[in-house]
């Protein structure tokens, strides 16, 4: 009996090792904006000392400095993850010399993979914009919205509807999306009802509400996107952003940090369930930077409580963790530059 148990464990460990070292068909990149190790631990302690993230056995650390600053912003941080280059703070989808650079999403699209973006904020905000747009100022929201029309992205879901229809140039990008055969959804129920084709989910006029008012928007929209993207037999690339971990950290609101981290972690768990079932999907979870300089002088694990101490209302320059699960996960261990993540995905997807 002992021999059988040892053999079974050996086979299981071997299978996990082979899985981690293989080549994925699909990649889901989940970005917890502003999510450092402390934010993760806050969610863990408050959640009975456990998170879905712990299912990822391949863990590393990402250096987040930009081309212009020790402490990055979400424009440069998102661009490094999306486009594989260090750029100046405030820039989107461009290198430090203001030259446009293809994102991993655009490369996937050019190689006939399905592509998608799901965000807990406006789809024109810095992190999602880094995967789709090329502008020298992250606040060029109308120009960023226009860039969605310049691609063939299959699915995008988030807020920011006003940048598509209440514009200075009087263009109605929602009509233009419909002309390109996008199904435009305005509620999460409408998003969940769409099973194929192209989807533009513009659920909020401006920014998405915070948790708990947002409900299950992020995990539900993520799985709805995966269901659509999975129709492509060649595979897909999906970026998912837990945007408001950052905002809660800017506010130094530890209780809200926990709510946003747990919403993001539920999304991670659902994606990991999909990846575990199908075996051909690489899941990467990381952050563009840490926000707030959060620390815990004391706490109580059994009670699920902690004393939170923030050192800033801005970003910090400390490295952030990266977690990976599935084929190719072994490539995301140790210390790495944020810009290297795009190159790793590109090689694994053979783009």
Predicted features along the sequence, with ranges:
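N-terminal catalytic scaffold of extracellular/periplasmic and nuclease hydrolases
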Residues: 21-160, 164-167, 173-191, 197, ...
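Bacterial Sec-dependent N-terminal signal peptides
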Residues: 1-22
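Gly-rich Lys/Arg/Thr-decorated short loops/hinges at beta-loop-alpha junctions or inter-strand turns
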Residues: 84-88, 198-211, 246-251, 323-327
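Gly/Ser/Thr-rich active-site loops/lids in small-molecule metabolic enzymes
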Residues: 256-272, 303-316
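Metal-dependent active-site segment of extracytoplasmic phospho-/sulfohydrolases and closely related
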Residues: 37, 262-301
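Active-site His/acidic residue clusters
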Residues: 126-131, 205-210, 214, 222-226, ...
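Structural motif
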Residues: 29, 201-203, 237-241, 284
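Functional beta-strand-loop-alpha-helix junction segments that form "active/interaction loops"
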Residues: 95, 185-222
């Amino acid at each position: 009996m002992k021999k059988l148990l040892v053999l079974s464990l050996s086979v299981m460990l071997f299978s996990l090792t082979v899985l981690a070292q293989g080549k994925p068909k699909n990649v889901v990149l989940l970005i917890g904006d502003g999510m450092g190790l402390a934010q993760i631990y806050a969610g863990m302690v408050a959640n009975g000392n456990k998170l879905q993230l712990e299912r990822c056995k391949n863990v590393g650390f990402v250096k987040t400095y930009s081309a212009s600053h020790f402490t990055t912003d979400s424009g440069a941080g998102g661009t490094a993850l999306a486009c594989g280059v260090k750029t100046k703070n405030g820039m989107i989808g461009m290198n430090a010399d203001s030259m446009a650079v293809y994102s991993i999403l655009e490369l996937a699209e050019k190689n006939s993979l399905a592509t998608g973006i799901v965000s807990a904020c406006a789809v024109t905000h810095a992190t999602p914009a880094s995967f789709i747009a090329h502008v020298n100022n992250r606040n060029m929201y109308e120009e960023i919205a226009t860039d969605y029309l310049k691609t063939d992205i299959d699915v995008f879901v988030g807020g920011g509807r006003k940048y598509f229809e209440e514009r200075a140039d009087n263009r109605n990008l929602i009509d233009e999306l419909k002309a390109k055969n996008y199904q435009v959804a305005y509620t999460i129920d409408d998003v969940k009802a769409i099973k194929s084709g192209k989807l533009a989910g513009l659920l909020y006029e401006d920014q998405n509400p915070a948790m708990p008012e947002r409900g299950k928007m992020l995990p539900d929209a993520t799985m709805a996107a995966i269901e659509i993207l999975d129709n492509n037999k060649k595979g897909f690339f999906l970026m998912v952003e837990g945007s408001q971990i950052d905002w809660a950290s800017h506010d130094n609101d530890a209780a809200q940090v926990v709510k946003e981290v747990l919403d993001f972690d539920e999304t991670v768990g659902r994606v990991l369930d999909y990846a575990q079932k199908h075996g051909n999907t690489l899941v990467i979870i990381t952050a563009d930077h840490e926000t707030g300089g959060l620390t815990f002088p004391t706490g109580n694990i059994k009670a699920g409580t902690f004393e939170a101490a923030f050192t800033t209302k801005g970003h910090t320059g400390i490295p952030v963790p990266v977690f990976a699960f599935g084929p190719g996960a072994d490539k995301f261990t140790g210390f790495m530059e944020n810009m290297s993540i795009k190159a790793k995905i590109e090689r694994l997807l053979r783009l």
